């Protein structure tokens, strides 16, 4: 059993090294090509009026974003942990995301207790993971989004809920796999990156369904006894669990 685990870890390490190498080798010519595009656009501003030129620049932006996401995906387990006061940390990130959607009519509810414990986390990466999950909720054609945190006996329970477009259990399972997305310009790496970061913190992330909650009739205006804001008639419910030690 130990030999099998060691072999698997070696394969994963080789995979990450290969992915890092490919990403690095591709990034250099992409950066160079992008520089050429910028020079061409500067010398020939009329190119901006060309639809094909705009399509090319959009594809280049997508390629650069894909390379950035590949790098993040490959480094999700490389964390720099530090003692972090979770109440101000979680409150700040949940409020910061809303600033990106101030012009949206979406109703947003935040529930973060003031006396959460201090945990050893990588604040930059955990912020990246939770921010991405919240952004997904806001971009899901939702009318309401909620972010709630509850301290349990041995963990912090974070729930992100929206009442946007519904997706099936099969789809939600697939979304944790790399390159699976419903977004037109999505890379399909957002959820895998978030899962990798959370698992690097020895935590877990999963979609919940009506039968897995205490009361599927609860709504964002009617939190259940645990403090979770629930609405499962449509949309999605993500639960993130972070251990206290």
Tell what function each PLM region has.
Residues 50-100:
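Conserved DHp (HisKA) dimerization/phosphotransfer helix of two-component histidine kinases, i.e.
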Residues 144-154:
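Short beta-strand/loop element within the Bergerat-fold HATPase_c
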Residues 167-178:
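Short conserved segment of the HATPase_c
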Residues 198-199:
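Detector for a conserved hydrophobic position within an alpha-helical segment of the HATPase_c
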